[in-house]
Design a protein with these regions (language model features):
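Hydrophobic, aromatic-enriched alpha-helical segments typical of multi-pass transmembrane helices
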Residues: 1-200, 205
Length: 206
């Protein structure tokens, strides 16, 4: 496996795997006892959530400029609005609860959830476009991976990374993206092998 190919596998699989691992430890409820860990956990994963947007874009790079832009814009919307959820309902709410102002958390939870929903819907749309493009291009080979990433994106909408459904959703994303990238890479290798290569004739001495 080439280094570039290995890097792309890591790019599509590592962010959801990290979120799944962290999700196992995520408190189900925000309380005074869990507030400090809740806050610190969301600070730690602040740069991880936006990385989920790379996988659907990577899968459509070879499907045309228009699809690349559509998925790119949807990924940007996801990253912007879901980060707001992480900051407000994660870092902000955890900080308020830790400082004894738990009565104010309902406000930041409400704002965060509304903004995060916009981001999650944009993510579902990006995943749907990317998976649909793979099915159109690669037919049945892309169906298992497309189903996995679609399930993962839908679970992400409401379960986020909470255990168990949120963790399952992130694992579905990781496995599905790896499956789809394998299909894309295999098709690229076959296409390259079938492409005629010019043969250079050796110069004949006079």
């Amino acid at each position: 496996m080439h280094a570039r190919s290995a890097l792309l596998y890591v790019t599509v699989a590592l962010p959801p795997l990290v979120l799944a691992a962290i999700g196992v430890t995520h408190p189900i409820h925000l309380t005074s006892a869990s507030a400090e860990y809740w806050r610190n956990l969301h600070i730690a994963i602040l740069p991880i959530f936006p990385l989920l947007a790379f996988a659907p874009w990577i899968l459509v790079r070879g499907a045309g400029v228009v699809l690349g832009w559509v998925v790119g814009v949807l990924g940007f919307l996801y990253a912007a609005f879901y980060t707001a959820l992480d900051v407000l309902a994660g870092i902000g709410a955890g900080g308020l609860a830790y400082d004894g102002m738990g009565m104010a958390t309902s406000t930041v939870f409400g704002l965060g959830n509304h903004l995060g929903e916009v981001g999650s819907v944009a993510f579902i749309a990006a995943v749907a476009v990317s998976a649909g493009s793979c099915i159109v291009r690669f037919r049945t080979a892309a169906i298992p991976g497309s189903v996995l990433v679609s399930v993962g994106a839908i679970l992400f909408l409401n379960a986020h990374i909470y255990f168990p459904l949120g963790v399952v959703g992130q694992l579905c994303l990781a496995l599905g993206w790896v499956w789809l990238y394998f299909v894309v890479e295999r098709a690229a290798r076959v296409h390259s092998a079938l492409r005629p290569h010019p043969v250079e004739s050796a110069a004949q001495p006079r």
